[in-house]
Design a protein with these regions (language model features):
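Mg2+-dependent prenyl diphosphate-binding active-site environment of isoprenoid biosynthetic enzymes
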Residues: 6, 12, 22-189
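Non-catalytic interface/linker regions that flank or bridge core catalytic/transmembrane domains
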Residues: 1-3
């Protein structure tokens, strides 16, 4: 199998995992669940899940554990995109060629989608068939990577810099925190 074919297989596997671990749109609250599914199952490069599966392949990791880790990291990534698109942040109206979550639904629903995806990510991760010590380490690492020391902190730097020029060090710090933290966990903690 070529690398491109393998990446496509991982993307498809991730799509199926997200579909499996997200609440069904038919369950209450239906609008929230439909919006979560809209945000997560609307395409994307799935770079972080590819890195999870690559690291897992090298380590000989359990397939279900990889699926859960990949889905959890992707849920956190998607929640960050949903929040990033909000009018109070970047005010984007398109994501992956489709209306953003707050445009397709509404701002309040989009905010709740981000919140729900973050907690769903941790709920998905803790059910992985792994040793409890490994799960605790994964949860700790994902929390740090997505919090003030990682993705959220990078977004705060980005927002504070609106209308200002960042120097090279500040720009690198913002990108390492905002983007690099989840990529790092994706390849390092399987």
């Amino acid at each position: 199998m070529s690398f491109q074919d393998w990446m496509q297989a991982v993307r498809q596997r991730t799509e199926l995992a997200l579909d499996r671990y997200l609440p069904p749109a038919s369950h209450n609250p239906q609008r929230l669940h439909a919006a979560m599914r809209y945000a997560c199952l609307n395409g994307g490069k799935r770079l972080r899940p590819v890195l999870v599966h690559a690291a897992g392949a090298v380590a000989g990791a359990n397939a279900e554990a990889l699926d859960r880790c990949a889905a959890a990291i992707e849920m956190v990534h998607v929640y960050s995109l949903v929040h990033d698109d909000l009018p109070c942040m970047d005010d984007d109206t398109l994501r992956r060629g489709q209306p953003t979550c707050h445009v397709q639904f509404d701002e309040a629903t989009a905010l709740l989608v981000g919140d729900a995806l973050q907690t769903q990510a941790f709920a998905t991760l803790v059910e992985a068939p792994l040793a409890s010590t490994t799960i605790v380490e994964l949860v700790r690492t994902l929390a740090r990577a997505s919090g003030a020391a990682g993705m959220a902190g990078g977004q705060a730097i980005d927002l504070a810099a609106v209308g200002q020029a960042l120097n090279e060090v500040q720009l690198e710090q913002m990108h390492v925190m905002k983007t690099g933290a989840l990529i790092q966990i994706g390849r390092a903690h399987v």
